[in-house]
Amino acid sequence: MLSSQTSSIFTVSRLNQTVRLLLEQEMGQVWISGEISNFTQPASGHWYFTLKDDTAQVRCAMFRNSNRRVTFRPQHGQQVLVRANITLYEPRGDYQVIAESMQPAGEGLLQQKYEQLKAKLQAEGLFDQQHKQPLPSPAHCVGVITSKTGAALHDILHVLKRRDPSLPVIIYPTAVQGDDAPGQIVRAIELANARGECDVLIVGRGGGSLEDLWSFNDERVARAIFASRIPVVSAVGHETDVTIADFVADLRAPTPSAAAEIVSRNQQELLRQIQSAQQRLGMAMDYYLANRSRRFTQIFHRLQQQHPQLRLARQQTALERLRQRMGFALEARIKQATQRQQRVSQRLSQQNPQPRIHRAQSRIQQLEYRLTENIRSRLSEQRERFGNAVTHLEAVSPLATLARGYTVSTTTDGKVLKKIKQVNAGDIMTTRLEDGWLESEVKSVTPGT
């Protein structure tokens, strides 16, 4: 019989391990309410204590990285609410609780309800970003749902008056604390939606304890905010206070004053933006005008470079350069002849026979005279040819022709008119005179006889 049950026999270690795994996996994380006793804190910083009620008790441990977040010092006999994991200390087989968080019993129960409602609404999708409505920009009317005697209303109105004095504000007074507060807040939200006077709502109150803010952790308020067709900004308590309303609202503001900042326009900032825009517009206009001025100057210079007078000036410059080159050529010829004469004289002087010298001198004088006359004749001839070339160039210049009373006519596409077959009656032609242009219409065309 013993051998048939061998597979069901546990060692002590295996038994404790199995029980620990069952406790951790099946129980998970739980909330435990009880009274603290035997509280100790050794040098390690961990807390060890017992939680008990009238009929039972359980050993608990809370490690340093968890207990440092507890905002109060636990006392013997104090009622607390602990969020913990159930486990077993295997070496001794001791069943114990490992605490993760601790709160005084009153706030602890509220916190437990808060966590349960938060998980429920989150599972339903009320916190999803896809349901968030965008705030109007700018807002044309702001609705405020809060106590008419609270500091929150004073803070909101003060900020709105400072930032945007012309912004209309409608107050929906309601209780924000007490048993009647959730119902009044819901009715105020529904009334604002029914009247449709505002395009954004601020729902909130000033700071307080968890009990003071509990109206904004009410499920009815959360669902009313979610159902609102008007975007809702939650502004409950201080920045560290987070309520269910904050998760459901379209936007959470850390304080009522911050909510007023969010929904209003800063008129001074708006004025600065307008002035900045005007300055940028002025700079853009200055740049545009300067750019167009540069473009005009470029076109003007290009037209000047294509003017007929400028072309004539370039031709005159080229003619002057040609004249200078001809002068330089003549001077070079004279210099070469002089040098040749000097060389001949030198050779003759070296031979020394007097008769030959006299004859050579006579011959040289004749050659010199003839050379001089020849050079003068050639120079005169070149000057005459140069003068004729200048006269010819001036004679064939279009401006000279126009000065003699002639005109040049062109068609509208710029072609010079040479024959009557290039135009027909009714065509427009342009005629160039010495001092300007004429535009005329062809009345008739008569062939020459």
Swiss-Prot record:
Recorded family membership: Belongs to the XseA family.
PANTHER family documented for this protein: EXODEOXYRIBONUCLEASE 7 LARGE SUBUNIT (PTHR30008:SF0)
Function per UniProt: Bidirectionally degrades single-stranded DNA into large acid-insoluble oligonucleotides, which are then degraded further into small acid-soluble oligonucleotides.
Protein keywords: Cytoplasm, Exonuclease, Hydrolase, Nuclease
Cell compartments where the protein resides: Cytoplasm
Catalyzed reactions: Exonucleolytic cleavage in either 5'- to 3'- or 3'- to 5'-direction to yield nucleoside 5'-phosphates
Name recorded for this polypeptide: Exodeoxyribonuclease 7 large subunit
Origin: domain of life: Bacteria
Quaternary structure annotation from Swiss-Prot or TrEMBL: Heterooligomer composed of large and small subunits.
Any one annotated GO CC term: exodeoxyribonuclease VII complex
GO biological process: DNA catabolic process
EC number of this enzyme: 3.1.11.6
